C-alpha cells in the first residue's frame, strides 16, 4: 500500500497532469471550423422528436415516449443502483429508495408527481427509483451555455449538456458509463395544448423537469448546475423535513417554459423564486439586449449579467463557476469558449459557428451528451448527440 506521502505525490501528479491537459494539445485544439451541418466522429446523430400532449391527464402524458424508451431507462436505473450497491452492498439504500422515498419527499408540485407515477407504471420501474432518477439531475449537470447577439441584434442560444461526472468510468472504451447510457434517452419534446406548440425542449426520457428549451418567438432557457456549500442536498433535506416553500430547479424551468409569456416575465420568476439547489439560468429573448445569466443561491439572486452589445458585451458564457471567480483549474471550459467566440467575432456569429464553438475541445469533452442550438425568432431548435473520441479530456 502506498504511504501517505507517496499517495499525496501521486494525487498531486495526477492533478497537475489534468491541469496541463486542460490547456495543451491534444486535449485542447484550435477553434473548430465548418463542423455544421454535423458530421464526422464527434456526431452521434440527431435527437428524435416526440409530442407531449398537455391536454391529457398528467398520468398519461408520457406513455408513448416511455413505451419506446423503457428498456434504455431500465439500463441507466440499474447502473445507478449498481453504483449505490457498490458502496452499500447490503442493498438497504435501494430498499429505502423503493419503499420510503416517495413518502419521505411527499407531494410534488403541479403535475409532476402524477407524471412520475405514470412513468413508473408504464416502465414497471419502482416509483422511488423514478423519483431518484429525476432528483439526480439537480446535482450532476456540468454544462456550457452561450447566448450571443449578432450585429443585426439577432440572438442565438447554444448549449452543451455535460452529464455523468464520477458516475462510473468504462475502462474498456474510456467513457463515462452514465453519459453513454443517457445518449439513447436523449429526446426532443414538443409540448402541445389544443394541437398547438406551447414550448419545445430537449431532455432525457423519464425526466419530467426541463433543463433546455424555448418558447417559439419569445425566449430560450438553459439550466446549469452551480456548485455551492449551501447546495441542493440541504434543500432536499429541508423538503423532507417539511419545509416546502422552494421549487425543484428542473420543475421551475419547465413551469417557466410552459407558462411565462415574455422574456421579462421569465427573468423575473427565475430571479425571485426560491429554489432547492443553487443554479445558473441562462435566458435569451427575441430582441437586442435580451440575454442574461442569472446566478442563483437557493433563496436569492446573486447576479444578473446581461448582454450589452453597445459596451462590447455581445455574448454571455456560463459553465459551472461564478463569472467573477476563476474556474476550477481542472475544469476550464469558459476560457476556450470565450476565445473561440472572440475569434468568430460579432460580425460572423451564426447558428453554424455556434456549433463550431461547442465542438471545440475541451468545451466538447467526454461528459458531453448532446449539443442544442436555438434560434427563438426563426423557430429553430436542433439537438445532436455527441461523441468525443480520444484524445479527449474527461470533463
From Swiss-Prot:
Annotated GO MF terms: fatty acid amide hydrolase activity; N-acylsphingosine amidohydrolase activity
InterPro entries xrefs: Acid_ceramidase-like (IPR016699), Acid_ceramidase_N (IPR029130), CBAH/NAAA_C (IPR029132)
Catalytic reaction(s) noted: an N-acylsphing-4-enine + H2O = sphing-4-enine + a fatty acid; N-dodecanoylsphing-4-enine + H2O = dodecanoate + sphing-4-enine; N-tetradecanoylsphing-4-enine + H2O = tetradecanoate + sphing-4-enine; N-hexadecanoylsphing-4-enine + H2O = sphing-4-enine + hexadecanoate
One GO location term (cellular component): extracellular space
Tree of life domain: Eukaryota
Pathway: Lipid metabolism; sphingolipid metabolism
Transmembrane segments: none
Active site: 143 (nucleophile)
Name of this protein: Acid ceramidase
Gene Ontology biological process: cellular response to tumor necrosis factor; ceramide biosynthetic process; ceramide catabolic process; fatty acid metabolic process; keratinocyte differentiation; regulation of programmed necrotic cell death; regulation of steroid biosynthetic process; sphingosine biosynthetic process
Family: Belongs to the acid ceramidase family.
Catalytic activity, EC: 3.5.1.23, 3.5.1.-
Species whose genome carries this gene: Macaca fascicularis
Residues making up the signal peptide according to the UniProt record: 1-21
Keyword set, alphabetical order: Disulfide bond, Glycoprotein, Hydrolase, Lipid metabolism, Lysosome, Secreted, Signal, Sphingolipid metabolism, Zymogen
Keyword Transmembrane helix found: no
Subunit structure: Heterodimer; disulfide-linked. The heterodimer is composed of the disulfide-linked alpha and beta chains produced by autocatalytic cleavage of the precursor.
Keyword flag Lipid metabolism: yes
Post-translational modification (record): N-glycosylated.
